[in-house]
């Protein structure tokens, strides 16, 4: 998992 994947997931959760 990279930062972009984390950012995308966080964006969905928020």
Swiss-Prot record:
Expressed by the venom gland. Keywords: Amidation, Antibiotic, Antimicrobial, Fungicide, G-protein coupled receptor impairing toxin, Immunity, Innate immunity, Mast cell degranulation, Secreted, Toxin. The modification Leucine amide is found at residue 14. GO terms for cellular component: extracellular region. It holds the Pfam family Mastoparan. GO terms for biological process: defense response to bacterium; defense response to fungus; innate immune response; killing of cells of another organism. GO terms for molecular function: toxin activity. It comes from the Eukaryota. It is found in: Secreted. InterPro entries: Mastoparan. Belongs to the MCD family. Mastoparan subfamily. Shows mast cell degranulation and antimicrobial activities against the Gram-negative bacteria E.coli ATCC 25922 (MIC=3.0 ug/ml), the Gram-positive bacteria S.aureus ATCC 2592 (MIC=1.5 ug/ml) and the fungus C.albicans ATCC 2002 (MIC=12.0 ug/ml). Its mast cell degranulation activity may be related to the activation of G-protein coupled receptors in mast cells as well as interaction with other proteins located in cell endosomal membranes in the mast cells. This is Mastoparan-like peptide 12d.
